[in-house]
């Protein structure tokens, strides 16, 4: 909300639909006063807002869609994501939960997606390990995950972040019926094990929607 109010103040207009030139000038203004991760978050908020207006048919076309935004990305090791980028990705995903037009099914899948991303980066586990996680190996009360790696070697991971645990608990509550019919913890919309390919596609899709210009590939 603060990000949208700031955009409104900058444009000095009350109309919902701004010209692409106004948006372009606003983005340049953001680059002058904020760090890159803050600029990305504010742009993501604006993109989510106009996406909502399109879905509600309040506007026909999002004015921000064709506005090019370029960032000098942080240098990172292959297959890793800098913290600032991860923060922006999750910020965008959480902002989608606030949209008033979310259906029950959409909210359910969104909570699953956020739980997957939070777990991947809170634990650092491989995507294959996450997709194969059995429910019996997860203790959300203690925040402990038991991961079986190569050679059936077990390792224990502790999640100490309250936000991550709360998101996992919310996911578990919403998917209780499906979870009672399988051993796996992360499921697809049909109640089956969430596949590695689907998880990678999901992360890539949100990264593109949030205008992250990195090749986001959790290992």
Specify the residue positions occupied by each region the protein language model found.
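Conserved catalytic core of the tyrosine transesterase superfamily
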Residues: 1-219
């Amino acid at each position: 909300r603060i990000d949208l109010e700031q955009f409104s103040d900058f444009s000095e207009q009350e109309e919902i639909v701004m010209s692409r030139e106004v948006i372009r000038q606003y983005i340049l203004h953001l680059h002058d006063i904020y760090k890159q991760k803050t600029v990305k978050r504010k742009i993501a908020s604006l993109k989510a807002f106009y996406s909502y207006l399109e879905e509600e048919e309040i506007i026909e076309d999002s004015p921000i869609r064709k506005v090019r935004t370029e960032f000098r990305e942080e240098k990172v090791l292959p297959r890793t994501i800098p913290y600032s980028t991860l923060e922006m990705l999750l910020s965008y995903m959480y902002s989608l939960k606030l949209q008033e037009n979310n259906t029950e099914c959409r909210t359910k899948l969104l909570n699953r997606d956020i739980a997957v991303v939070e777990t991947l980066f809170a634990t650092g586990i491989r995507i294959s390990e996450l997709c194969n996680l059995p429910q019996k190996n997860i203790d959300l009360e203690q925040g402990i995950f038991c991961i079986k790696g190569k050679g059936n070697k077990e390792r224990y991971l502790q999640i100490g972040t309250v936000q991550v645990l709360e998101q996992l608990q919310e996911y578990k509550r919403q998917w209780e019926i499906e979870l009672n019919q399988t051993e796996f913890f992360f499921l697809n919309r049909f109640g089956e094990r969430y596949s590695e390919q689907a998880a990678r596609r999901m992360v890539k899709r949100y990264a593109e929607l949030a205008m992250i210009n990195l090749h986001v590939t959790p290992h």
